[in-house]
Amino acid sequence: PSAVNPNAEIYAKLGIPFVMGTTGGDREALARTLADSGLYAVISPNMGKQIVALQSMLTQAARDFPGAWSGYTMKVTESHQSTKVDTSGTAKALVECFQGLGLKFDVSEIELLREHQGQLAFGVPQDHLDSGHAFHTYTLTSPDGSVVFEFKHNVCGRRTYAEGSVDACLFLKSQIDAGSEQRVFSMQDILRAGALS
């Protein structure tokens, strides 16, 4: 996360369009760097296309149905390889969507699994404990416990992020070639354009 802004500044100085998938850095400074340079870029907190689509759907649901899950409780558990020290940006973003749907939940309540024993019990395959995984479960329970909703997105490896990154590069190239007035894009822009391989 600490390399986000210095890297963007280097790209801007050299005039190199770029794709960056991160939840880190100073977003306001990043926006200023891009605006000042006029550089083309795709910046997204998540490069997994389907995960971005899920987040977009929940964001829209929060706009369309505010308070739909008022009174429900929520439990969020996320697991990543032990080298990840911070809370998942994707989990934080989805919690924000659920808050819009009426759930009272703070991101500090997200349960982080970084130890192998807990990860295995959570369903992470042995082969992906240290080589890369992102498992998330959001459980919503009605006040009387009679209704439970569960949302999950589990990723083993890095392929889905690599595929999204390739799509982002191809999309960015097409926007540059077309002389697009818009210079900074997100994965949502790519999904809306149907620019998927």
Predicted regions and their residues:
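Short hydrophobic/aromatic-rich motifs at helix boundaries and adjacent loops
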Residues: 30-34, 66-68, 137-141
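Short, surface-exposed acidic/glycine-rich loop or hinge patches that mediate macromolecular interfaces
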Residues: 2, 24, 48, 81-84, ...
